[in-house]
Amino acid sequence: DFTTPEQGTIVEGDVYVLVIDAVTQRLKYLVEDLRVINDYADQKILEGTMQRTIGNEQVRLVVLANLNQNQIQGVSEGMQAYLNTMVGNTAVEIYNKLVYNYTGPTPWNLAERRLPMWGISPATGVPPAGPSLECKLYRAVAKVSLWVNGKQGLQDTKGDFIITGITVNNANDKGYCVSQATLSPDETIQYQSPYVTGLSMKPQNFVYTGLNVTMAYEDLIYLPEQENNDSGAVSLDVTYTYGGETKTKTIEFRKDGVGDRFEVVRNHVYIFNVSSI
């Protein structure tokens, strides 16, 4: 999925670099003086001070972003302080504790709630001059888009097809900031399955009202990961006007409305195209 500038926003004070021992997989320390430099096109540059490694010692850098606005369970004194309490824990133990909440009737709004993201660097030593590393960041949520006839719109003699409301049914209310599902080496695939192990979910609905969509509604609907079983499956109720009538139809998370359901997987976009009525 392509990322818009708004989706890729990272700000100082809400990005964290964890230095993980490459052998033991335990957290050694956090980079405390982290700075974000945004003057590099579509890249984000993070600068900070690291401790030199000794001999053959290697570390990996875990980058976590946009946690403050996402109601991380168990956090009361701020994320940096919370993460510092986990020095000595394994990366997996830390990941299991980083659960964001998405509750209430209000849909996700990027102006008020940045998207939680995670990435990890290759193993490296830290020379006196410091390492220069790259990593890709993966969003902890999936994205849903609705197109009308391939974003060309639909018309008849009585006017345009207009989407006036969307209800997301049975969305999960939380998710892990970091997935422990296997990350594919193929960047076009990324994650292939959701990771929701151990989470107790409460299904909920989100309502988008007052819409006037004739071409596309995209980059606005975000969902936690979900094993999309027949019992309580996520779906979209789309209310529209066309041909002088107002109707509501349900869109299932299936290819062409039939077959097996799509699971909801982070960092993927699910595009549903309304091509005919």
Which sequence ranges carry the predicted segments?
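Extracellular beta-sheet/turn segments enriched in Thr/Pro/Gly and aliphatic residues
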Residues: 81-143, 147-151, 256-277
